[in-house]
Amino acid sequence: MSNYNLPDDNGHFDKYGGIFIAETLMTAVFELKDAYARFKNDSKFICEFEQDLKHYAGRETPLYYAKNLSKKLRGAQIYLKREDLNHTGSHKINNTIGQALLAKRMGKTRIIAETGAGQHGVATATVAARLGLECVVYMGEVDVARQSLNVFRMKLLGAKVIPVTSGSKTLKDSLNEAMRDWVKNIDDTFYIIGTIAGPHPYPMMVRDFQSIIGKEAKAQFHDQVGGLPDALVACVGGGSNAIGLFYAFIDNVSVEIYGVEAAGHGLEKGPSAHAAPLCAGNVGVLHGNRTYLMGDENGQIIEGHSIAAGLDYPGVGPEHAYLKDSGRAQYMAITDKEALEAFHILTKIEGILPALESSHAVAYGIKLAKKLGKNKSIIINLSGRGDKDIHTIAQIEGIEC
């Protein structure tokens, strides 16, 4: 039995989380809260979710011993949780399956979503196609340009992709537009948020659907090695892949937990040069919950930067804010340059192309492995595959595709 029982009934992780939304959204949020409370322990719902994870998404994903990388570093032994091998290419499908099944039970016929890197958009469009639901995806104009492959995939799946031209034209603005849509179409629309942000119950619900990552990794490590790993590493934008890995280990205090944010051009260059609210932000309210965010003294959101579209978000899930303050997890930041280097290292040494988001975790995992001895072990969450980033990397490095 876990000693960790957050959030409370009102969605609070101590002083973080909660429900901070306009009155016009209250009905929809409380309808969702009641529905999730009703179905999350329902045996038929759980069975259908687990069967879809197995037979549709392709779970369980492997825990792969990165022998070549471990040997090269001469430090800790590195294991990769291969979420990149899921159907659609990332961890995002775990959550979209769960929320789409809930939407069907609530009688909703239309699905909306926001997306940055496009992986959540693809995963949402995928489950919507399978369940016969209308699908609309909001995506920042900047992200549409740098993730054109995923835009095409969403359209092939039958989704309508709406470029968002307001603000920084990235993930934050996509989430804003999706919420505006939801307000106007409450009766027939279900909003599938892709990360552990938003008002309660989203941070809890998305965590619960993603927690399969850590449950599997814990059992797999025990079977392959015995005992527990010494450390966990995962990238953090909103933070769903990270909490998916971390959650099963929170009570295991011998396991060190590291979340890795996007340092972009460098933390020292100011808030517009990175996307690292836990490392260099302050506390405020964003997208319906209290958390760490990138904001100025007047409470205005500062637009940040990351080479990875999925990390380019000015806030973070409230559970990560709590884990930071409580000291249970530590949060680091990796620059664009370091992430690119890690991308090439893993690709050339292990034959695995990680997403640029995941490359941030790989980069810090490499640093950590060098500090630890050979008798130590690290699990790195490889949250997605890097096919979507090939053109971005080629453009940066001046390579013709």
UniProtKB/Swiss-Prot annotation:
Residue numbers bearing the N6-(pyridoxal phosphate)lysine modification: K92
One GO term describing the cellular component: cytoplasm
Pathway: Amino-acid biosynthesis; L-tryptophan biosynthesis; L-tryptophan from chorismate: step 5/5
UniProt entry keywords in alphabetical sequence: Amino-acid biosynthesis, Aromatic amino acid biosynthesis, Lyase, Pyridoxal phosphate, Tryptophan biosynthesis
Cleavable signal peptide: none
GO molecular function terms noted in the UniProt entry: tryptophan synthase activity
Enzyme superclass (EC): lyase
Reaction it catalyzes: (1S,2R)-1-C-(indol-3-yl)glycerol 3-phosphate + L-serine = D-glyceraldehyde 3-phosphate + L-tryptophan + H2O
UniProt-listed Enzyme Commission number(s): 4.2.1.20
InterPro entries assigned to the protein according to its UniProt record, in alphabetical order: Trp_synth_b_CS, Trp_synth_beta, Trp_synth_beta/beta-like, TrpB-like_PALP, TrpB-like_PALP_sf
CDD domains according to UniProt: Trp-synth_B
Domain of life, source organism: Bacteria
Cofactor names: pyridoxal 5'-phosphate
Protein purpose: The beta subunit is responsible for the synthesis of L-tryptophan from indole and L-serine.
Subunit record text: Tetramer of two alpha and two beta chains.
Family affiliation: Belongs to the TrpB family.
Name this polypeptide is given: Tryptophan synthase beta chain
Organism per entry: Vesicomyosocius okutanii subsp. Calyptogena okutanii (strain HA)
